[in-house]
């Protein structure tokens, strides 16, 4: 009898919890005049559909299917439920403009719980003032005049990378190599770290963290999220030690403010816990190499698919080489001449945006396109929604770098770096390392895809070729 009562109480508590969850879930969508759409299951919402679309090789499908069902050219907004939050997805140039121009007025940046649990203090700083100061510091460090001194360093790293990782190889898998290249540059630029063994050790932990950042936040042994949390603790310990050492070097006058971004931050950000600063550096390292490595990978892919584009890039880079003495490295003036090469990289980012989109949080109630968006709701904007829209880019499936000649795309249609106050501060940094990669690549090699008809892209959480892009390489004559 006692056991039966306990079982009934246990089952009743579970049922009550489920009913409360359902009530909370439904309460999010009880407001009048909300955008049309589906909310999915309680708590889970449509998160699995959102993630699985990318993992199945059709990252755009989640957005396009719902735009077709729920939106029109005039509304361009639908509701869903992602990562535990009611969410309005805005699409189109007008949606991008609305979010980017209302940053810190109606919306603020927001990250899923998985990000905040892995990086408690890096992605969301403790105050708006701290966030503003950090962005200002990054902008100062990443502006063109400040980056000039890194051209030679990046070029040297690129030459060494292609000599040790690509030369004398018949076949390579591109994506792991581009990650290695951009991570080496990030370690050198942000931490002045050059020891290959130490860089390799950090890279392994970073890769584990990057895979788990946008996973379902279930902290059970063996899950991506669990592995990412463990790896982030090891990274935090390692980078905190570097921070402490650099503080001592700055006190002793053994390091300069312009030495790297860590010194720059220590000299300007004020008193900060080593662990908090380590989280910020880790976040920057991930942002500073993951997205650029994706662009470099797909540059290799599209240059293999379109020989006439490869030839124009090669011609442009050969012209730069002709003006240089033997073994003379690249300079900032050379980067400025790589106009067609950058058009190619821009077209790559249009078709395969390295970041599909990001979230915002409504900090007040407001109306968009005639629909009510409650305070506390999350908003998601998608780069693909405009990049692959024929109204903005005719024949969007066609690879055409000349789209970026002259004045280029219309405002708010091409957004690989976001926009508004939250636009990626590392845009010029990314341009620099991508162009230096292209320069060294085409001047040394020709290549062909091992699987010429394999174009599947998996977004997990960032877009990568399904097989990592294996290619056969040949020395440039």
From Swiss-Prot:
PROSITE patterns for this protein: CYTOCHROME_P450 (PS00086)
Keyword Heme part of the UniProt annotation: yes
Superkingdom of origin: Eukaryota
Membrane topology: Single-pass membrane protein
Disulphide connectivity of cysteines: none
Primary residence: membrane
Keywords associated with the record: Heme, Iron, Membrane, Metal-binding, Monooxygenase, Oxidoreductase, Transmembrane, Transmembrane helix
Named cofactor requirement(s): heme
UniProt GO BP: triterpenoid metabolic process
A Pfam family recorded for this sequence: p450
Record PANTHER family: CYTOCHROME P450 26 (PTHR24286), CYTOCHROME P450 716A1-RELATED (PTHR24286:SF349)
Protein's name according to its UniProt entry: Cytochrome P450 716A1
Species for this entry: Arabidopsis thaliana
């Amino acid at each position: 009898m006692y056991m039966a009562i306990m079982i009934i109480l246990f089952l009743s508590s579970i049922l009550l919890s489920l009913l409360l969850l359902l009530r909370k879930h439904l309460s999010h969508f009880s407001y009048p005049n909300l955008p049309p759409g589906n909310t999915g299951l309680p708590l889970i919402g449509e998160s699995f559909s959102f993630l699985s679309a990318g993992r199945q090789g059709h990252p755009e499908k989640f957005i396009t299917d719902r735009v077709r069902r729920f939106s029109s050219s005039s509304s361009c907004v639908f509701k869903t439920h992602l990562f535990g939050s009611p969410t309005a997805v805005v699409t189109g140039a007008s949606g991008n403009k609305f979010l980017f121009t209302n940053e810190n007025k109606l919306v603020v940046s927001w990250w899923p719980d998985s990000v905040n649990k892995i990086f408690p203090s890096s992605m969301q700083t403790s105050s708006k003032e701290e966030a503003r100061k950090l962005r200002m510091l990054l902008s100062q460090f990443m502006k063109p005049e400040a980056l000039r001194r890194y051209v030679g360093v990046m070029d040297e790293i690129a030459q060494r990378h292609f000599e040790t990782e690509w030369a004398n190889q018949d076949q390579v898998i591109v994506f792991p190599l581009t990650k290695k290249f951009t991570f080496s540059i990030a370690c050198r630029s942000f931490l002045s770290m050059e020891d290959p063994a130490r860089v390799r050790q950090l890279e392994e932990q970073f890769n584990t963290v990057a895979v788990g950042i946008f996973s379902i936040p279930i902290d059970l042994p063996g899950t991506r999220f669990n592995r990412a949390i463990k790896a982030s603790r090891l990274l935090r310990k390692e980078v905190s030690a570097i921070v402490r050492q650099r503080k001592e070097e700055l006190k002793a006058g053994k390091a300069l403010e312009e030495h790297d971004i860590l010194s720059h931050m220590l000299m300007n950000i004020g008193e900060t816990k080593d662990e908090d600063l380590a989280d910020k550096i880790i976040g920057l390292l991930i942002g500073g190499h993951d997205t650029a490595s994706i662009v470099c990978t797909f540059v290799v892919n599209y240059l293999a698919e379109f020989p006439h584009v490869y030839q124009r890039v090669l011609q442009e880079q050969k012209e730069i080489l002709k003006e240089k003495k033997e073994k003379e490295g690249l300079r900032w003036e050379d980067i400025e001449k790589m106009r067609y090469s950058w058009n190619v990289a821009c077209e790559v980012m249009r078709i395969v945006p390295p970041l599909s989109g990001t979230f915002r949080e409504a900090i007040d109630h407001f109306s968009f396109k005639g629909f009510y968006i409650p305070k506390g709701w999350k908003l998601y904007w998608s780069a693909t929604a405009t990049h692959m829209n024929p109204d903005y880019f005719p024949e969007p499936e066609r690879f055409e770098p000349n789209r970026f000649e002259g004045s280029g795309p219309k405002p708010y249609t091409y957004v690989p770096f976001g926009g508004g106050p939250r636009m990626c501060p590392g845009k010029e940094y990314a341009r620099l390392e991508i162009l230096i990669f292209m320069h060294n690549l085409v001047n040394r090699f020709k290549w062909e895809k091992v699987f010429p008809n394999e174009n599947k892209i998996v977004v997990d959480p960032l877009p990568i070729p399904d097989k990592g892009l294996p290619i056969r390489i040949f020395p440039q004559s």
